[in-house]
Each structure stands twice: as structure tokens, then as C-alpha cells.
Design a protein with these regions (language model features):
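Conserved short hydrophobic patches within well-ordered secondary structure
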Residues: 13, 45, 77-79, 107, ...
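Amphipathic alpha-helical interaction surfaces in cytosolic regulatory modules
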Residues: 23-98
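STAS-typified acidic loop motif
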Residues: 2-31
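Short charge-dense sequence patches
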Residues: 7-18, 36-39, 55-64, 114-116
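Non-catalytic signal-transmission and effector/linker regions of two-component phosphorelay proteins
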Residues: 1-7, 119-124
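Structural signal for conserved beta-strand scaffold positions within catalytic alpha/beta enzyme cores
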Residues: 15, 100-102
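A charged, well-structured terminal subsegment
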Residues: 102-124
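General small-molecule cofactor/ligand-binding pocket signal
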Residues: 6, 79, 101
Length: 124
């Protein structure tokens, strides 16, 4: 699986450069994403702009990844999801379980807001 990672002060922006995200790619996705939870910068914005097709197992795996990130007090936001991928996730009843932003910029905003929420939550 081909992807590009850009790291900023608060998050990793990862763009998957494949037309299909399927179950047989989830191990590679884990190998890329799970080690990031051990770094100082843990938050991830996953850009799915190039993904044209996703199968149910891959969609379910994204939900599990997101859950793993939130359990570790880290953000996991999908962005730039194509309409056909959105429809596939919705048909599998997964769309509402995922944190999705229309653009990468809006995903960054979500990460920043969640960081503020975590900081405020820690202060009480």
C-alpha cells in the first residue's frame, strides 16, 4: 500500500495513494498507524481522497482503529471521503461511527478542538 505521511506539531496527515481500501490491506494500515500511538505526536488525519472503493471489513477496521486512538487520548479523523465510499460506509452502518471531515483543513480543526477538550478535561 502506498501512502504519504506529513507530520506537524499536533498530528500526522496520512494520504493513502490507492484506489481501493480492502480487508487485505488492513495489516499494512495497522503497521503504519499503530506505532504512531507511541510517539509524542499521536493524532492522525487520514486522507481518503484517492480511495474510490472500500469493502465492509476495511470500513469496520477503520472504526476499530479510531476506537484504539480515542482509547489512547488521541484523535483519528478521516477526511476527503469520496461519495461512493461514504455510501458504502453508510450501507454497512459504519458512517455514523466514524469521525469524518469534508476537507483536510476541517480535519485539522477537529484535531485541534479535541486537543483543547482533552487539556480542559485533564485540568478538572
Amino acid at each position: 500500500m502506498q501512502f504519504k505521511i506529513d507530520t506537524s506539531e499536533k498530528f500526522h496527515a496520512i494520504k493513502i495513494k490507492e484506489p481501493v481500501l480492502s480487508a487485505n490491506m488492513t495489516a499494512e494500515l495497522d503497521a503504519c498507524l499503530m506505532p504512531l500511538l507511541q510517539q509524542d505526536v499521536k493524532n492522525v488525519v487520514l486522507n481518503l481522497q484517492d480511495i474510490q472503493t472500500i469493502d465492509n471489513a476495511a470500513g469496520e477496521h477503520l472504526v476499530k482503529l479510531q476506537h484504539s486512538y480515542y482509547e489512547q487520548s488521541a484523535s483519528f479523523v478521516l477526511c476527503c471521503v469520496q461519495k461512493q465510499v461514504e455510501k458504502a460506509l453508510d450501507a454497512a452502518d459504519l458512517l455514523e461511527l466514524l469521525n469524518i471531515a469534508p476537507t483536510e483543513s476541517e480535519a485539522w480543526d477537529i484535531v485541534h478542538m479535541e486537543e483543547i477538550e482533552r487539556e480542559l478535561g485533564d485540568s478538572f
